[in-house]
Swiss-Prot record:
It holds the Pfam family Methyltransf_11. The keyword Methyltransferase applies. InterPro entries: Diverse_substrate_MTase, Methyltransf_11, SAM-dependent_MTases_sf. This is Uncharacterized methyltransferase Rv3342. One of its GO terms (biological process) is methylation. It comes from Mycobacterium tuberculosis (strain ATCC 25618 / H37Rv).
Length: 243
């Protein structure tokens, strides 16, 4: 049975532990570029377990986290008990009009319905506010990372796929940051296990995929007998200003 796009977008709750253990955070340079200098109150839309939320809170910002998956928000609330965390979606944001300086969407814009989300984001932003989108994509120029992609699927490039932000947003800009995430072999397995494709696959397909990743870890010259891995990323950013 084929999962719908919506079902895939909501599947992460069943793998929340793997998601939290395996997914990377976001580089400071990307966050610097996405945020307007004067931002004080920021909405992390599609916050998940709080990978980006944590980085925003560390900057002393007043952050509101919104996500449609209760299990993800439970993890976020446990880690950031002082942060407001609300159940909601990009199509129905549970905030007042003109209430935030920036809306950041990390690793989630590809799940939303832009026709419904754009008016909602514009509604909650203050005039001149910023919408920022960000994706961590594996840098598959490195041999073993390319082989990983052959097992679990290539990482899409949102810029290549022509993400657009229509009116009332203007001055759409794009930026990339190259960086390296350091993780354990088990965290790499968790990263794979937290992907929507893996979560929603039949059990035998999921098991085979994870076994192939373990085989790569055990046999690739750059990975075998290693307690730590360096996984290169290209973080893709898109930002636009509310007219």
């Amino acid at each position: 049975m084929t999962c719908s796009r919506r079902d895939m977008s909501l599947s992460f709750g069943s793998a929340v532990g793997a998601y939290e253990r395996g997914r990377p955070s976001y580089p400071p340079e990307a966050i610097d570029w996405l945020l307007p200098a004067a931002a004080r109150r920021v909405l992390d839309l599609g916050a998940g377990t709080g990978k980006l939320t944590t980085r925003l809170v560390e900057r002393g910002l007043d952050v509101v986290a919104v996500d449609p998956i209760p299990e993800m928000l439970d993890v976020l609330r446990a880690a950031l008990p002082q942060t407001v965390a609300l159940l909601g979606t990009a199509e129905e944001i549970p905030l007042d009009d003109n209430s935030v300086d920036a809306v950041l969407v990390a690793q989630a814009w590809h799940w939303v319905d832009p026709a419904r989300a754009i008016p909602e984001v514009a509604r909650v932003l203050r005039p001149g506010g910023r919408l920022g989108l960000v994706w961590n994509t594996r840098d598959e120029r490195l041999g073993w990372v390319r082989e990983l992609g052959e097992i679990i699927g290539r990482d899409g490039d949102p810029v290549r796929d022509r993400v657009t932000l229509p009116e009332p947003f203007t001055t759409v800009q794009r930026h990339q940051v190259e960086w390296t995430n350091y993780l354990t072999p088990q965290a790499l397995i968790d990263l794979v296990a937290s992907r929507s494709y893996c979560i929603t696959s039949p059990a035998q397909v999921r098991t085979k995929t994870l076994d192939r990743v373990r085989q790569l870890l055990a046999t690739h010259p750059a990975l075998a007998n290693s307690n730590g891995l360096a996984l290169p990323y290209v973080t893709v950013c898109v930002r636009a200003t509310l007219a």
